C-alpha cells in the first residue's frame, strides 16, 4: 500500500534509508522531519510504501525551489533491499508521477548511484546528463595536511561564528555559484538558507569550521554528522573568490576531519561533479577515495537550459 508520509513515520524512514543506501549518507529521524519543511513554493509531497505495519519504501517529489528556472521538478526514493523486485518502486513512482503532473513540472531531475537505480530511471524516460564522484574517508586513518593558519586569518568552529551568519551565507552562495550542477542554484534567500541549511538538525556546529579574515567569514567547511551511527557528510566547502588559492578550504576541511576523528566517526562522505577538478584534487589530498559514480538524470523535452 502507498500512502502519504506522516511525521510519526520519520524514525522508521530513517532506518529504512540507512539500510537501503549502499553508501553511508547521514540520515537521521530529525533530518527526515526537517526535509518536509521546504519552502511552500516547493509543493513537496512524500509517500511511504507499507507491507502490513512495516515501512518498506519512501519517495518524494517537489519543485526545485532553489533554482530560478521554472517548472523544474525533483524526485527520489528508496526501497528496502529485501523488498526489491516486487513492484514497490514502480508503485511509489506512480504516485510521484501524478504529483509531478499536478504541479506542472516540465523537467524532472533525479539521481542514482548504482546500476539498478540507473536502469529504473532510464526505463521511465530519464537520461544521464552529469556525473558526480562519491568519495569517502575514514578520518581516523588519515592525517590531513593544511593546518597552518596563514597570517591574518583565524579558524573557528561554526558555533563561534553564528553572529556572522549572513556573511557565512555569502560564502555558501559563492560556492553554489561555482559548483557545476544540472540547474543553476541561484534562488535562495538568506531566510530560506537559515532554515534549510543552518537549521538542519545534522549540521554540526562544532564539527563545521569557518575561516575568518579579521572578523569576516571567507571560507567554510560545513559538516553534517550522525553521532549515533558515527557517520558524516560534507555539506559544503567554499571560499570567497578573492580569497581562493591560499589553502583556506583545505584548512577548514582538514579541521573538520580531525574533529570527526576525535569523535570516532568512521566515514565522511562527499560528492563532487566530475568537472570540478579543484575540489576533487583537494579531497584526494585529504585522503578521500572514490566509492562510486553517481549519475544525475533529467526527464524532459530539452534538458537543462
PLM region spans:
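Active-site/acyl-donor-binding loops of N-acyltransferases
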Residues: 124-143, 207, 258, 263-305
Amino acid at each position: 500500500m502507498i500512502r502519504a508520509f506522516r511525521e510519526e513515520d520519520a524514525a522508521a524512514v530513517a532506518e529504512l534509508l540507512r539500510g537501503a543506501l549502499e553508501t553511508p549518507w547521514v540520515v537521521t529521524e530529525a533530518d527526515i522531519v526537517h526535509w518536509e519543511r521546504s519552502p511552500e513554493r516547493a509543493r513537496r509531497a512524500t509517500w511511504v510504501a507499507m507491507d502490513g505495519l512495516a515501512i518498506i519504501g519512501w519517495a518524494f517529489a517537489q519543485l526545485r525551489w532553489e533554482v530560478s528556472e521554472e517548472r523544474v521538478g525533483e524526485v527520489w526514493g528508496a526501497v528496502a533491499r529485501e523488498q526489491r523486485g516486487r513492484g514497490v518502486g514502480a508503485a511509489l513512482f506512480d504516485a510521484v508521477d501524478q504529483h509531478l503532473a499536478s504541479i506542472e513540472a516540465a523537467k524532472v531531475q533525479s539521481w542514482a548511484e548504482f546500476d539498478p537505480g540507473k536502469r529504473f530511471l532510464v526505463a521511465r524516460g530519464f537520461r544521464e546528463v552529469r556525473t558526480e564522484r562519491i568519495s569517502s574517508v575514514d578520518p581516523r586513518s588519515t592525517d590531513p595536511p593544511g593546518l597552518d593558519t596563514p597570517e591574518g586569518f583565524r579558524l573557528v568552529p561554526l558555533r563561534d561564528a553564528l553572529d556572522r551568519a549572513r556573511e557565512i551565507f555569502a560564502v555558501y552562495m559563492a560556492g553554489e555559484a561555482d559548483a557545476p550542477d544540472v540547474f543553476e542554484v541561484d534562488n535562495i534567500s538568506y531566510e530560506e538558507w537559515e532554515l534549510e541549511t543552518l537549521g538542519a538538525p545534522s549540521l554540526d556546529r562544532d564539527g563545521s569550521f569557518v575561516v575568518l579574515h579579521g572578523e569576516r567569514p571567507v571560507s567554510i567547511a560545513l559538516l553534517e554528522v550522525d553521532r549515533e551511527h558515527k557517520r558524516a557528510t560534507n555539506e559544503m566547502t567554499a571560499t570567497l573568490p578573492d580569497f581562493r588559492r591560499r589553502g583556506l578550504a583545505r584548512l577548514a576541511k582538514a579541521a573538520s576531519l580531525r574533529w570527526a576523528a576525535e569523535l570516532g566517526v568512521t566515514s565522511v562522505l562527499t560528492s563532487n561533479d566530475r568537472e570540478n577538478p579543484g575540489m576533487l584534487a583537494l579531497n584526494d589530498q585529504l585522503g578521500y577515495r572514490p566509492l562510486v559514480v553517481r549519475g544525475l538524470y533529467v526527464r524532459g523535452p530539452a534538458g537543462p537550459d
